[in-house]
Amino acid sequence: MAKRHKHFESRGGFRKKRGGGRGSQRGRGSKRGRGGRFRGFEETERSASEPGAWLNSSVPLGDGDLSNPDMMVDNYRPRKHISQDTITDHYFGRKSSLKLNSMRMAGLRHNDWRDPNNGNSASFRKRPIEFIKANCTYDPSRDLILQLANRSKNQESKEPEEDANKCSEYAEHSEKDMEIDTAATENDANISYDESDTDQEIGNFNHSIENSKHNNNISECDITAVTDQELFFVDEEGMDISQKPTKVVHITEHEKKMGSNVEFHNVLTVGKVEISLNQDENDEVYVDRKPTAKYHPFHNYISNVIERMQEEENIDSDDFEDEDDIYLDNSGNDMPETELDQDEIIDLQRHDDKDHAVQTCAIPTNTLSNDLDTLHITESNDDRITINNHNMDSTVETDKEKDPEFGFLEEDYAVNTSEVIVDNIRLGLNDNSYFLKCYRFFGDYSFHWIDQEAFVSFLTEDLELPMNRVGAYLAYVKNSLVPDETPPSPTYSDIPFSDTSNESDEDNALPNVDAVSSCSNDDEDEELGDDVDDLVSYSLKYANSRNIDYETRALEFTGKGKKKKLLVNEQLDLDNETMETLQAKLSKRMENKAKKRRLKEDFIDKENMNSDDLFLKYPYGFHVQNIRDEFELFLTRNKDRMSFPPLDPHGNKVITKFATCYNIKSSKVGKGNHTHIMVEKVKKTKWSRPNYNMVLQLTRQRPVFMRIDVRRPKEDAIKENSGRRGPTAKFHVKEGEVVGENAPEIGQDNIGRRMLEKLGWSSGEGLGAHGNKGISIPVMARVKKSKSGLRHSKEDEDTGRSSSFRKK
């Protein structure tokens, strides 16, 4: 019989008596019942009577004191043994109040720990600390030094007599040192230390340490007998260091410049405007204002020539001023206005006009520069520019501050201008027209022409653009569409450089530019040569048109279908024949495209056009529009299933995607080349709406799907692929044919033949010098198409076959 464990006894090994109080036992064990106060007493009494059993109780004996004589007496019933929990409770405390088996509480009695008046009940960190003075001074470092000195001396010592003498000397020195220390402590206030005394004391101390290394017979009792005052010296006053000068050293700290963590870009893009930036050493960003004029290789030469011309003009102008002064003096003093006749006055006026023309045309005077300084340009409201002179007109208009470009003010970003897309502009005399797209204004996403007045009202009222920024925005739109026409750089091609320095007075009198060109230096012109002027003028003339980027645009058409025509710009000035040729090419191109384009009607069999069987209706393949139409018809029919012909794996996947969009179940049927898709209606198909967005995406992808279980007739395949393969080859080669056998001889017009004939070659001769000429008959190259050997020709094959037949 198997052994029963202890836990079976509590499950019905013997019946227990009902306990008093409320309720009774429930279940199999007494621990699960809700009996009275003394439930399970008979069981505990029976188990306690067994030898070696513990009395299991959580009530401490004798208030937790094991030395209590009443410990064995229980308040409720007598205890025969001490339980294990009682001892644990005595040393470590209750489980509910303290940690389980805490060693910190093992040294405390349980009853003492509960007593609040007991001083030992406080924690160790809260108890007071008591300090007790030691009987002797504890100096382990000094003892360690002496022990090491004795050990080293014992290893080196050989003669004990010398050691004894040294020990006596060490004792004498130690007594002297002790006397000095005691005297120093008594007369500490009257002693002043110098640097020499301190050095001597340090030397004596080192000497005493050296002597102590040689001593090995001094006992520890001699050291302990010395008092602390004799061993240690306390300097209460310290050294007087006020008399020593202190050097002040000033160190300049160089602060390291911290690099900025911001990445710098030299181009700032605001809309379609690019601004070049630069950064200095202090990480400050500024606008890089570079000159707009492009550098030219002859720039320095031209500038030097103009400077020399100006210098010579200044020299000549001084001479003219002197002559003018003399003439004015003579006219003012000798010839008063009252004495002159009318004819003489006219002659003087002519002479003055002549001199004035020479000065203004040939020589720039100071009055011209003054007039240029007084001139200024003003801009009116109607976009017209007027030039005013301070000296000529008394009413001076103030310069109108130019508004900054669009995108440089915060007001420009308060409006969302991305809603308006301007694609073209038509410039007019007063107003412009804009070709723009704006859903907020037109209600669609197509481009429309709009005049400037309506466009400005939309910007100010709907987009809430400030009125003062409308002009800047319109200028920004215009600059983005119409490129700025940079003025051409001066070519100076119309300024001839004269070879002689002598000029007639008649040439100076006329307002011609030749007077300016006469100031050039003759020596430099001779050195540079005659062709330098032409080279400079030619290079400057075509400098701007050398690297020009031409915009490429698609052809513009009008009309649809057969009425589609080509739009040609009127600025090209094409004749009627050219226009007709272009239109004919366009129509031919459209016809070829229409022939190549395959429609969904091309895949449907005309005999089975209304059939429900797709295998008969589409004998060779599908167009993607055919697949969509079949799904639409399948939704309207009463049929529950429909099978598609076998297609390639990608085509089957496309049909599965179409079925998912129409909420139809799809499954594969068949094997190999006969694998096709079968679709079936479900409950969701009737009540759900198809996903036409996904269907539209599928129709824009692969257009044609051909069947893989049937083959098309050869005639249809040839017609379809005839345009792709191109024309057939015109030349064919045969086995054993000589390459170039029927080629004509190289004519005498050939350059290579002429060169050979000049070198002495004639037709029929070999190439090379006399005595070392090459072959006269060229080597013939034959065509080899078969896999037989090089010497195995077609004639040999024929002869071999005939001989074999003869042998048989």
Swiss-Prot record:
| Record's keyword terms, sorted | Cytoplasm, mRNA processing, mRNA splicing, Nucleus
Instruction: Supply the InterPro entries for this chain.
Output: G_patch_dom, R3H_dom_sf, R3H_G-patch, Splicing_assoc_domain
Q: Which SMART domains is this protein grouped with?
A: G_patch
Stretches assigned to the G-patch domain = 748-795
Q: Return the GO cellular component terms, semicolon-separated.
A: 90S preribosome; cytoplasm; nucleus; preribosome, large subunit precursor; preribosome, small subunit precursor
Q: Where in the cell is it found?
A: Cytoplasm; Nucleus
Sequence segments annotated as region (Disordered): 1-67, 151-180, 485-529, 764-808
Tell me which stretches of the chain form a coiled coil: none
Pfam families per record: G-patch
Where does the record place Basic residues bias? 1-20, 28-37, 782-791
Protein name, per record: Protein SQS1
Organism lineage: Eukaryota, Fungi, Dikarya, Ascomycota, Saccharomycotina
The protein's gene is named SQS1
